[in-house]
Amino acid sequence: MDDGCNSLESLIKYYPYFKDNESVQKFIIPIQPQFHEDLFPDFSNMKGSLFEKDQSLYSCQGNTIKKAYLCHSKIKTIRKGDIILFYRSKDRKSIQCMGIVEDVLFSENIDEVFPAIAKRTVYKYSDIQNILKKRTLVILFRYKALDKEISRQQIAKAEIKGNIQSIRQLSN
């Protein structure tokens, strides 16, 4: 799929397919189970349970392709078109979904951040205000579920050592 488009343009044009070559940086982002459940409800522990079809338990933003991730990481190398892999920490210790970065910003300003993430996040306005009490990394991305989960054992075989506790850039 080398059509002259960058990875973000390719994703938009060919979704669910995406570009992955040497020019595309990759990052692994740890995410705690409760936040993973909110951001990616299709991987919820409720799936297959009695309450799976109870839509009141899920926010509409959780069921979108366009999403936002907020954190206090100081990493500054993530850019538009990069691939981000979400590592569900603590319970599953695996990667089940990924995203292609649409935009990145650092801010403490609710007037700048809220319009950018309002329809992409599961957070309430008051939650966002609390998060923004210090400089926040905001990653806007397009979500893609992986066909197959990547286990912690597979991650270790890929030379990703140690506990995954902060955003890490991966080598190609």
PLM ranges: what are they?
Residues 95-105:
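Short beta-strand-centered aromatic/proline hotspots
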Residues 65-74:
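Short alpha-helix capping/helix-loop boundary micro-motifs
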Residues 93-95, 149:
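Short catalytic/ligand-binding loop motif for oxyanion handling, primarily in non-cytosolic enzymes
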Residues 88-92, 144-145:
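Short, flexible beta-strand-to-coil junctions
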Residues 1-49, 107-172:
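Contiguous surface segments at macromolecular interaction interfaces
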Residues 48-65:
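Short, basic/aromatic beta-hairpin or loop at an interaction surface
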Residues 74-88:
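Short coil-to-beta transition motif at edge beta-strands of beta-rich domains
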Residues 22-24, 79-81, 94:
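Short gly/pro-enriched beta-turn/loop segments at secondary-structure junctions
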